Every structure is written in C-alpha cells, then in structure tokens.
C-alpha cells in the first residue's frame, strides 16, 4: 500500500536499478565503468571522474527512435511524461511478449502512466535474461 500524501505531496518511488560494473547489459552493449582522472588524495585540487555507459544501462525508457529511424528522439520527449501518478500491473509469466490478455479484467481507462512490473526486476543484477518481456504489436 503506498504511503498517504503528506501536505499535498505524494511519495516518490525510485524504481531504478543500481548502476554498477556488474550490471548486465544488452549483449554487445557498453558496460558501465567509473574511473578517477584526478584525486585530491593524490595531490589534485579537485576530484574528477570519467563515466562510461550506454544510454540503455539499467532502468531507462526507450524513445521511439530506438526502434524506428523516423521515431522521436529522447530530447524531443517532455520530461513531464515520466513524472506523476502511475498504475502498476504485475505480469508473472516468464516467456513471450506482453499481450492484451495480460490486462484482462483491469480497468486501465484514463491512465496517463502505466508501469509493468515483470519477473526481470527480480533477476540478480549481473544476469541478462535469455527471454525478456516486450510489448507485442497487438
């Protein structure tokens, strides 16, 4: 049960996976790395770091451009689309695409945001699924 709103504010849930060098990525994609380029403990005046990662590292939302050349780029999508109340549907089936029958008996009318919780969230961070859920054309 979500917490009650406090003084007109709602609780913000962090649904992201922790980014680390052991986090599994799409086969062939760039893994996360973090390195210091300067360190104060080695005499530098500041700490500086370098991050290397794919935009598909960890929890993320794919823009339409990810799957079609004429789709909208991420920068064209308003951030407001990703912030606000959301409805969560859990789909326990571990194989195949997400189909309309997965939502049978659920009232989804008027929703602005739908989050789909699947078994992939329960995998260890270093394991990439052989078969993962995806929305079908239906």
Which residues fall in each region the model found?
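Active-/binding-site microenvironments in catalytic and ligand-binding cores
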Residues: 1-138
């Amino acid at each position: 049960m979500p917490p009650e709103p406090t003084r007109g504010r709602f609780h913000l849930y962090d649904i992201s996976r922790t980014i680390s060098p052991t986090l599994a990525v799409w086969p062939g994609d760039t893994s996360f790395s973090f390195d210091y380029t300067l360190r104060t403990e080695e005499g530098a005046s500041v700490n500086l770091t370098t991050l290397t990662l794919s935009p598909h590292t960890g929890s993320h939302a794919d823009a339409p451009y990810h799957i079609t050349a004429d789709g909208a780029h991420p920068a064209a999508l308003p951030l407001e689309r990703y912030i606000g109340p959301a409805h969560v549907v859990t789909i326990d089936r571990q194989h195949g695409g997400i189909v309309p029958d997965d939502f049978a008996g659920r009232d989804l009318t008027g929703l602005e945001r739908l989050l789909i919780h699947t078994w992939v969230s329960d995998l260890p961070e270093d394991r990439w699924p052989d078969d993962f859920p995806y929305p079908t054309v239906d």
